[in-house]
């Protein structure tokens, strides 16, 4: 994909290359095979310790340089890394994070053992790692934007959300652009209208609906609809968009998607994705 945001620049992958295939090479990169982005979904833990420092460390120790994570904000404005809006599913505590002070959230233990990390902890622990951040609630919009500005993370983060409005609200507050991925509505526009609109009209629609978007992050299927098809990948690349697929945990499916030319894979099985990329010669 031509002229990607610095988030996708060399150095983000274990072998220092970027997403996409040779046919999508950036000028000056013709001599370098461009590796897909390998993204560890909530880190890597076979024991259910998702979004814990232990899980992030395990992924980084495997060689991952892109971590996917989620942010919520406590009642007193502290940005934490956690997927659910409540603590109930994976900790011994109960309640909505947005209603609880940081001191209460700090007592929670993921899987009974691991504390919920602060956003600040993750960026300090792994200063060279890039973060795919899913903004889970409106309370986190200002908190995340402030953290990106305070730590100059514009080139290290990709801001994602199922809500296009939340993503845009974060990006609007930044002094320079951070990478972004499409939300549910923008993805639906591209998936549903892409095959039926003439290319020129689709280009106009894409520019309007996908302003500030650098990647389409999608599941292989949504209900009965197959999202990731050869045509979908071609259309995305034609409009300068990367395709990242979540959450892919089977090696055969990883190979199939990589053969289609997707630019990134989000996985719970960082170990298996590393093996697949090693087999394909795109892991250092």
Enumerate the language-model features and the residues they cover.
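Phosphate-group recognition and catalysis centered on beta-loop-alpha active-site segments
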Residues: 1-284
């Amino acid at each position: 994909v031509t002229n990607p945001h610095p988030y996708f620049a060399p150095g983000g992958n274990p072998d220092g290359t970027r997403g996409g295939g040779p046919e999508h090479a950036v000028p000056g990169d013709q001599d370098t095979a461009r590796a897909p982005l390998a993204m560890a979904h909530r880190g890597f833990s076979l024991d259910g310790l998702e979004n814990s420092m232990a899980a992030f460390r395990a992924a980084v120790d495997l060689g991952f340089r892109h971590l996917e994570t989620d942010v919520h904000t406590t009642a007193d404005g502290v940005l934490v890394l956690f997927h659910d809006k409540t603590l109930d599913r994976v900790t011994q505590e109960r309640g909505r994070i947005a209603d609880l002070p940081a001191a209460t959230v700090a007592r929670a233990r993921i899987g009974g053992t691991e504390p919920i990390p602060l956003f600040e902890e993750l960026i300090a622990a792994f200063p060279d790692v890039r973060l795919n951040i899913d903004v889970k609630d409106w309370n986190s919009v200002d908190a995340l934007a402030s953290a990106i500005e305070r730590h100059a993370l514009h080139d290290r983060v990709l801001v994602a959300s199922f809500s296009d409005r939340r993503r845009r609200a974060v990006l609007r507050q930044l002094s320079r652009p951070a990478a972004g991925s499409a939300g549910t509505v923008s993805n639906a526009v591209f998936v549903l209208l892409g095959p039926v609109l003439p290319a020129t009209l689709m280009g106009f629609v894409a520019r309007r609906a996908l302003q500030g978007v650098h990647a389409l992050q999608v599941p292989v299927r949504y209900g009965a609809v197959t999202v990731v098809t050869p045509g979908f990948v071609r259309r995305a690349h034609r409009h300068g968009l990367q395709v990242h697929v979540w959450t892919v945990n089977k090696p055969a499916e990883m190979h199939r998607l990589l053969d289609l030319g997707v630019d990134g894979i989000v996985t719970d099985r960082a170990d298996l994705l590393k093996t697949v990329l090693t087999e394909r010669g795109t892991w250092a």
